A protein has these predicted regions:
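Conserved phosphate/anionic-ligand binding catalytic regions in large, soluble enzymes, centered on
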Residues: 167-186
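Long, Pro/Ser/Thr-rich low-complexity/intrinsically disordered regulatory tracts in eukaryotic proteins
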Residues: 1-165, 180, 194, 199-201, ...
């Protein structure tokens, strides 16, 4: 039987991908996106790893019934992960709306999305609830205000596990306390090209923060995209964590900007050649793998930040990078595709978009 809630959500997901945005989000150099995530659990139930299916179903039902009454999810039911096709699950991971863990162990896992896909709630992942709010810049105040209101609502309407000494209780001890993970996706091609990235990663880690690949723990930084997040959740307030993260990101942005200046002065022809070749490939490809695509688009995002192509198209570049991922292509086509079909379709999407991108104007 077709789940109408799942169909409506995937249709909305597809519409957002295909929309020609008029009010585009403001972007800043180096920063791609940001996220605040809260881990919460219900009192009286075992953590997900140790709970029986019946208890997990009860947890999900309670959470879903409560969320349906919240204005962001008014009359929106959660949908079961097991109701999704494989490529639909993968698209949600590619879009960072849910984790790889949620789609791998999905017996009683559910997901709720806001209409704009900027807020998502995972049920029965590692914790009973994983609440996420996304942004396109460093405006953590607005993001925190939004997630804090939602969290207050859940705490008022559900019996959330909380200890006066330790704070919010979570399945993983490293999340105990605030239960908050704040992260920023940054684009650091120049630090990689100038071989400074290892030193930067070590410096960030010494300050108590973690640097991971594009899709978090265990993933590769394809296209030189890195995720920086807090490691400590106990003994610090949410405001302290966010303030420290913002300071670190600003420092990383400065180091990346300085590395780009070094490339302009010392390896100018090499830099221009790489950017020019990437644009040529994107305009002329007829079959393109996902890694090649993200590496070429990465150079175009760098070119936009450095004003070699209009900065105004950076948002579009970020979006085309998402649309050209394998599962997203299948969502757009609304059917599963073979690998060769995906690579041909990806090339078609990229050719069409980059035909509209102005030629690179080097200094």
């Amino acid at each position: 039987m077709v789940n109408p809630q799942k169909v409506a959500i995937m249709d909305n997901f597809r519409d957002i991908l295909l929309a020609d945005d008029k009010a585009k989000h403001e972007t800043i150099p180096v920063v791609i996106s940001s996220r605040i995530r809260l881990a919460r659990n219900l009192s009286g139930y075992r953590f997900v790893k140790y709970a029986c299916r019946d208890d997990l179903r009860k947890v999900a039902d309670k959470c879903e019934d409560t969320l349906k009454k919240y204005f962001l999810f008014k009359d929106k039911g959660a949908f079961s992960i097991k109701s999704l096709l494989d490529y639909e699950k993968c698209a949600l991971v590619e879009h960072h709306l849910c984790s790889q863990e949620l789609i791998q162990d999905f017996n009683e896992s559910r997901l709720v999305l806001s209409g704009d896909n900027m807020t998502s709630i995972m049920m029965n992942e590692e914790d009973h609830l994983r609440i996420q709010v996304f942004g396109s810049d460093l405006d953590f105040k607005a993001m925190f205000d939004e997630i804090n209101v939602l969290d207050d609502y859940l705490c008022e309407n559900l019996d959330i596990a909380f200890d006066e000494k330790y704070g919010f209780l979570t399945a993983c001890p490293t999340n105990v306390g605030t239960g908050m993970r704040a992260s920023v996706m940054v684009h650091l091609p120049a630090l990689v090209m100038t071989k400074q990235i290892t030193n930067i990663i070590h410096a960030v880690q010494k300050l108590g923060f973690v640097v991971r690949g594009t899709f978090g723990e265990g993933s590769e930084p394809n296209g030189n995209f890195f995720q920086i997040s807090n490691q400590q959740t106990l003994g610090l307030s949410e405001v302290d964590i966010l303030s420290r993260l913002i300071q670190i990101i600003r420092s990383v942005v400065e180091y990346e900007s300085n590395a780009r200046e070094i490339l302009k002065k010392e390896r100018q022809v090499w830099l221009y050649d790489n950017m020019g070749r990437a644009l040529g490939v994107l305009r002329g490809c007829y079959s393109m793998g996902s890694i090649d695509a993200i590496n070429c688009i990465s150079l175009m995002i760098m070119a936009s930040d450095m004003k070699y192509i209009p900065q105004s198209i950076k948002y579009d570049l970020n979006k085309i990078m998402m649309k050209s991922q394998s599962a997203h292509i299948q969502v757009i086509e609304a059917k599963p595709l073979k690998q060769q079909e995906i690579e041909i379709k990806r090339a078609e999407i990229l050719r069409k978009f980059f035909a509209t991108v102005p030629d690179i104007k080097f200094e």
